[in-house]
Amino acid sequence: MKDIFEKLAAQENLTEAEITAVAEKIFKGELSEAQIAAFLMALKIKGETPEEILGLVKTIKKNAAVIPSQTSDAMDNCGTGGDKSFSFNISTTCSFVLAAGGIHIAKHGNRSISSKSGSADVLEELGINVVLAPEKLAQVLDETGIVFLFAQKMHPAMRYISPARQALGIPTVMNLIGPLTHPMDLETQLLGLYQADLQDDLAQVLKLLGRKRAVIITGPDNMDEAALYGKNHYTLLDNGQISQGSFTFEDFDMPKVTLEDIKGGDAKENAQILVSVLKNEPSPYLETTLLNAGLGFYANGKVDSIKEGIDLAREVIASGKAYAKLKALQEAQVD
């Protein structure tokens, strides 16, 4: 590791082979927590390249659990986290709306790393078993159109890196690659990113991973979700072509909602918020969900514009289908 640390300290990029070799050492348990933390920090300070990110992603995916699903067009909408916004679980709430709108959702997520409540925490609070066997998870997805894939269960070797991540307590390359290491080969993806200037790099990685269509979104104040109070920046990957765009709440005639308006709490509080949104109870949480679910429908290609996606999300929630999708998962993803 000495050569690697010296190279990173000199602000030199690693080759895919070099970072793959480091990743294999990490995921075999051959490096100490101190070495892993030093590696993550050195990479963060230098700045990660698409090649470095791809090398890590490939190594992690190679060792991931296999989900034997018959679903070939699955989508994920998880974000990187790490934005310190302490908002409610937006992408988790949106996943039920997207699934109710006809998209097969394989939601990849974890426990809280830098927030009060991760997706796994809030779903457990709702009675959903996040540690089922891969075969059962595949059955749930095929039968209900939605499933939650717990990252720790999908990537058991990640246990070697988790203590270092928690000790650091700040976003690292592992936040960036979390949404990229989905165990299934996704067709489409909505990826929330806490740093807008990294969007193009991640779009390049998604392209190399074979995504047909994807949207990477960074909200105001570097949120890893779209928000209704400032400018949102996104990158669209569509059949190999990459383009950028931006929007504000005013573009869609939606109300202004501040970050303070959508603060979440612990898993119990966030579970209550999620249910209230899916029951179509008016609130800033509902409006924020409509925006992000609309963006998800657009990322999937289900609609031709974000505005059409917002309208579809509104219709799906008002019809009761989104809440029904939650009930379906609660009944299916159990012991």
Curated annotation (Swiss-Prot):
Binding site for anthranilate 2: 165
Protein origin, superkingdom: Bacteria
UniProt-annotated binding residues for Mg(2+) 1: 91, 225
Pfam families, alphabetized: Glycos_trans_3N (PF02885), Glycos_transf_3 (PF00591)
EC category: transferase
Necessary cofactors: Mg(2+)
Sites where the protein binds 5-phospho-alpha-D-ribose 1-diphosphate: 79, 82-83, 87, 89-92, 107-115, 119
Residues noted as binding Mg(2+) 2 in the record, renumbered to the chain: 224-225
Pathway: Amino-acid biosynthesis; L-tryptophan biosynthesis; L-tryptophan from chorismate: step 2/5
Textual note on the cofactor: Binds 2 magnesium ions per monomer.
UniProt-recorded Gene Ontology molecular function terms: anthranilate phosphoribosyltransferase activity; magnesium ion binding
Catalytic activity: N-(5-phospho-beta-D-ribosyl)anthranilate + diphosphate = 5-phospho-alpha-D-ribose 1-diphosphate + anthranilate
EC number(s) on file: 2.4.2.18
Keywords tagged on the record: Amino-acid biosynthesis, Aromatic amino acid biosynthesis, Glycosyltransferase, Magnesium, Metal-binding, Transferase, Tryptophan biosynthesis
InterPro entries: Anthranilate_Pribosyl_Tfrase, Glycosyl_Trfase_fam3, Glycosyl_Trfase_fam3_N_dom, Glycosyl_Trfase_fam3_N_dom_sf, Nuc_phospho_transferase
UniProt-annotated binding residues for anthranilate 1: 79, 110
Family: Belongs to the anthranilate phosphoribosyltransferase family.
Function statement: Catalyzes the transfer of the phosphoribosyl group of 5-phosphorylribose-1-pyrophosphate (PRPP) to anthranilate to yield N-(5'-phosphoribosyl)-anthranilate (PRA).
NCBIfam families for the chain: trpD (TIGR01245)
PANTHER family referenced in this protein's UniProt entry, alphabetically: ANTHRANILATE PHOSPHORIBOSYLTRANSFERASE (PTHR43285:SF2)
Subunit (UniProt): Homodimer.
Annotated protein name in UniProt: Anthranilate phosphoribosyltransferase
Taxonomy of the source species: Bacteria, Bacillati, Bacillota, Bacilli, Lactobacillales
